[in-house]
C-alpha cells in the first residue's frame, strides 16, 4: 500500500446509516490491543476555539519537556496535520503502516467503522507506539458519542466556548449542546470550562457535580489585553504578564486564558509545567487558518470561522486590527450553517463579496450564496473556482484588505491559490 491508497481507504469509508455510539470504536481499538489505555489525555470539546486551545496546550506541554501527541480536525492543507507529535506531522510511511494494521481489524467488523472512527484508531495507535507522555485530543463533534470519548480517565477535560452549531446532531438549545459536550466529563477527572453562557454553564456544573469532577471556570476578570498588531497580540493573565501570542485574532487571548487555567490545573495534579514553559509554549504556538495573515500589505486574512458564534469573534478581530476599513470578502459557507446570521455580521464591513464553492458536498453553491448576499444590499459575484475567486478578490481589493472566510474546508485551497498567484 502507498500513501495515496492509504488516503483512498480512509476517505472511502462512508457514514452508511451508522448509529452514533462508541461500540465500533471500542471494538476496533480492542482488536488493536487497546492502545488508548496506555496513554494520558487532555480532552478538548466545545463549539469554537477547540483547535486553537488544543494547539496552545500541546505547545506548552512540549515546552515543559513532555512528548506530546496532538489530534485535531479537520486538516487545512494535508491530512497528516490531524495527527502530530511535538509539532511534527505523522510521516507518510508511518501513516501507511498504521492503515495496514487498522484495515484488517476494521474490515473484520460486522458494523464497519466510520471514517472518523478509523482516524481516531490510527491516532491512538500512533501515539501509543511512539510512547507519548500525554495526548491533546480534540473532539470531532459533540462529546458524549464522539469516537474520541472512548478514553476513560483524562488528566483533564477542557470545554471551550459554546455556541449554536451542529443543532441537527446535538439538539436545538444551548443546554442540549452543553449536555453533549459534558459527555467528556469523567468521574473524578478535573474539568476546566471557558464559561460565559449561563444556560450551558449550569448543565456543565451539574454534570461535573454528578461525576464528582473538580470544576474550574476561567476567571476572565484577570485577563488584560495590552496590545495587538498584525504580528502578535499581547496580554497578561493572572500573574503571567505581557505574553506575546502569535495568533492575532482578538479572541485568542481568551483561548490562551483557558489553556493557562487548564495547564495550572494539570500542575496541581502532579504534572511538571513551569510558568516559563507556559509562556514559551504560547509565544511559539502556530495554528494555521485561524485569523491568519497571509500577507501584510495589502492585507490578506485567512480565517476558518464557520458559524455565527465564531463569525462574531472574527468580525471583532477585523475591526480591532483594521479600524475603519472595509473588506473584500471571499466566502464559502456550508448550506447547513446559519448562513443569514453570518452574512448579517459581515455585511457592515463589506466593500463587496466574491463567492466560491468549497470542495465539500455540504457547501452552498457560489451562485446561491451570492444571491443571499445581494439580499443584504451588498455587491456579490460568484467565481467559477477557488483560484479564480482569490484572483478576483485580490483584483477588487486593490490596496485594501481581503478576508477569506466562512469554512475551514476551503482554507487549504485558498492558501494554495494565493501562493500560486503571488509566486
Residue ranges and their predicted role:
Residues 194-195, 207-229, 246-250, 278-284, ...:
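Beta-strand->loop->alpha-helix junctions that form or flank phosphate-binding loops
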Residues 197-216, 230-234, 299-302, 308, ...:
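C-terminal helical cap/extension that packs against the catalytic core
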Residues 110-111, 118, 131-134, 138, ...:
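Acidic, Mg2+-coordinating active-site environments of NTP-dependent enzymes
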Residues 1-16:
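Charged, amphipathic alpha-helical linker segments immediately N-terminal to NTP-binding catalytic cores
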Residues 18, 22, 26-37, 63-152, ...:
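ATP-dependent carboxylate-amine ligase catalytic core
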Residues 37-38, 134-137, 145-158, 162-166, ...:
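Nucleotide phosphate-binding/pyrophosphate-handling subdomain across enzymes
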Residues 44, 52-69:
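A conserved segment at the C-terminal end of the G1
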Amino acid at each position: 500500500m502507498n500513501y495515496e491508497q492509504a488516503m483512498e481507504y480512509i476517505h472511502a469509508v462512508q457514514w452508511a446509516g451508522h448509529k452514533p455510539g462508541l461500540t465500533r470504536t471500542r471494538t476496533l481499538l480492542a482488536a488493536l490491543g487497546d492502545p488508548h489505555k496506555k496513554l494520558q489525555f487532555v480532552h478538548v470539546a466545545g463549539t469554537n476555539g477547540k483547535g486553537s486551545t488544543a494547539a496552545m496546550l500541546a505547545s506548552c506541554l512540549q515546552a515543559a519537556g513532555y512528548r506530546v501527541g496532538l489530534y485535531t480536525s479537520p486538516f487545512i492543507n494535508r491530512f497528516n496535520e490531524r495527527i502530530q507529535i511535538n509539532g511534527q506531522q505523522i510521516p507518510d510511511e508511518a501513516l501507511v503502516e498504521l492503515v495496514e494494521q487498522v484495515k484488517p481489524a476494521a474490515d473484520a467488523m460486522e458494523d464497519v467503522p466510520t471514517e472518523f472512527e478509523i482516524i481516531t484508531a490510527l491516532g491512538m495507535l500512533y501515539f501509543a507506539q511512539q510512547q507519548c507522555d500525554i495526548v491533546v485530543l480534540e473532539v470531532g463533534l459533540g462529546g458524549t458519542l464522539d469516537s474520541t470519548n472512548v478514553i476513560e480517565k483524562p488528566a483533564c477535560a477542557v470545554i471551550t466556548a459554546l455556541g449554536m452549531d451542529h443543532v441537527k446532531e446535538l439538539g436545538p438549545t444551548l443546554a442540549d449542546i452543553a449536555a453533549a459536550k459534558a459527555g467528556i466529563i469523567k468521574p473524578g477527572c478535573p474539568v476546566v470550562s471557558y464559561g460565559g453562557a449561563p444556560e450551558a454553564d449550569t448543565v456543565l456544573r451539574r454534570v461535573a457535580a454528578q461525576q464528582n469532577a473538580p470544576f474550574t471556570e476561567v476567571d476572565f476578570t484577570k485577563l488584560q489585553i495590552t496590545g495587538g498588531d498584525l504580528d502578535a497580540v499581547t496580554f497578561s493573565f493572572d500573574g503571567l504578564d505581557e505574553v506575546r501570542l502569535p495568533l492575532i485574532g482578538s479572541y485568542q487571548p481568551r483561548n490562551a486564558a483557558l489553556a493557562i487555567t487548564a495547564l495550572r490545573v494539570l500542575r496541581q495534579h502532579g504534572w511538571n509545567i513551569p510558568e516559563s514553559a507556559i509562556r514559551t509554549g504560547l509565544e511559539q504556538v502556530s495554528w494555521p487558518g485561524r485569523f491568519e495573515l497571509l500577507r501584510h500589505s495589502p492585507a490578506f486574512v485567512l480565517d476558518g470561522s464557520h458559524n455565527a458564534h465564531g463569525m462574531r469573534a472574527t468580525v471583532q478581530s477585523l475591526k480591532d486590527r483594521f479600524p475603519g476599513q472595509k473588506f473584500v470578502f471571499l466566502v464559502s459557507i456550508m448550506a447547513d450553517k446559519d448562513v443569514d446570521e453570518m452574512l448579517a455580521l459581515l455585511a457592515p464591513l463589506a466593500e463587496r463579496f466574491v463567492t466560491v464553492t468549497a470542495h465539500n458536498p455540504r457547501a452552498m453553491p457560489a451562485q446561491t450564496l451570492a444571491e443571499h448576499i445581494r439580499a443584504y444590499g451588498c455587491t456579490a459575484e460568484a467565481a467559477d473556482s477557488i483560484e479564480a475567486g482569490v484572483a478576483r478578490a485580490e483584483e477588487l481589493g486593490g490596496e485594501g484588505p481581503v478576508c477569506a472566510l466562512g469554512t475551514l474546508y476551503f482554507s487549504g485551497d485558498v492558501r494554495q491559490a494565493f501562493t500560486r498567484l503571488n509566486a
